[in-house]
Every structure is written in C-alpha cells, then in structure tokens.
Amino acid sequence: MTSPDLPEQPASDLPADAVILDVREPDEWAAGHIEAAVHIPIGQVTARLADIPQADPIYVICRGGGRSSRVSEFLSAQGIEAVNVAGGMQDWAASGRPMVSDTGRAPEVI
C-alpha cells in the first residue's frame, strides 16, 4: 500500500531516459534487471544514500511495488524527488520492456 501523496507511474509508461533505482535483493537483480538501472538493495538504501543518482525524479522499482513504495517514501522524506514504479519488475517484464541477466540465462523476474 502506498501513501496517497506518493507519486506512482506504471512501468510501461516510464520515459526511455528514466533514472531507475532497483531495490531488490542481489539474487533477484542477477536473474533479470533493467540494464541502466542502479542497484541498491532495500536494506542498504540508508547507508548508501550518497550512491543514489541525482535525478529529478528518480524512479524506484522492486518486484511488485511494495518495497519500492517504502523506499520512495523514505527518499521523499530526505528531499529527493522519488516516483514509485507501480507493478514493479513484474509489470516491466509483462509489458515487454528490455531486461538483462547476470546468470547466463534468459532474464526473468523472480
């Protein structure tokens, strides 16, 4: 569940030049991710705040939208313009948007 004030955008509607922060766990990332995304697992976001790209906005994604919603709320509280990617990587993959894998297999969302 997201805050009514938290901006959301469906994965299928993200602009081609969107700056994306993927907050999934390393095994999820390895199985399939957006090539240009920055990967910082949710448990490391606070400690790695300085590693988050400067972008207005930054789009935050996870598997289905729950973890990314929490991170988006946190980033917004830090003064960072964050947009939650509604539906997450599941919707990204379902809409046919490109993904890459670090496993040597076809990319997938796990």
PLM regions with names:
Residues 1-19, 25-57, 68-110:
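Rhodanese-like catalytic fold shared by cysteine-dependent sulfurtransferases
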Residues 61:
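Short, surface-exposed ligand- or partner-binding patches at beta-edge/loop junctions that are enriched
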